[in-house]
């Protein structure tokens, strides 16, 4: 864990990565298994209702509303894959990372990403531009980076994330 002098410590690698410049694995929000293709139809928390898809967990508005807005540990990929002392950041913790660190585009081991340096203590982490995965597979590697938080957005079809581009 890297101490950036913020409210939480940050991992030195992505989930599934060995080195900081490794992309790691891709996951849908609230899922703990990676896939080669990501669609609404194969999303863990959707259920087919004829022609429609219905969200069945982490729902704040529908008929299955459970009003859960933070991932449970069993649905938090960092907790499941990295161990019980790990979890994904909350939206507020991600905001703190953005606001209390200096972000600089760098290349590390041939991989573009951001060196995120704490304005509090000078320690840093590297966040690779790992892109994303969708119905067409992996996209925008070395161009963009997207990182989930544990926090559900007000619309249950969306979750808070932080993202960046090479520009």
Language-model features and meaning:
Residues 1-167:
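C-terminal, surface-exposed recognition/capping segments
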């Amino acid at each position: 864990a890297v101490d950036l002098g913020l409210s939480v410590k940050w991992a030195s690698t992505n989930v599934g990565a060995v080195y900081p410049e490794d992309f790691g694995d891709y996951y849908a929000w609230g899922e703990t298994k990676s896939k080669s293709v990501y669609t609404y139809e194969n999303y863990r928390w959707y259920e087919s209702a004829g022609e429609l898809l219905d969200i069945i967990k982490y729902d704040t508005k529908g008929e299955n509303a459970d009003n859960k807005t933070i991932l449970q540990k069993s649905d938090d990929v960092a907790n499941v894959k990295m161990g019980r002392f790990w979890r994904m950041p909350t939206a507020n913790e991600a905001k703190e990372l953005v606001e209390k660190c200096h972000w600089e585009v760098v290349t590390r081991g041939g991989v573009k990403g951001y060196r995120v340096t704490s304005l509090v203590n000078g320690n840093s982490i590297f966040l690779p531009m790992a892109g994303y995965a969708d119905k067409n597979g992996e996209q925008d590697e070395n161009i963009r980076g997207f990182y989930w938080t544990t926090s559900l957005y007000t619309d249950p079809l969306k979750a808070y994330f932080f993202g960046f581009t090479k520009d």
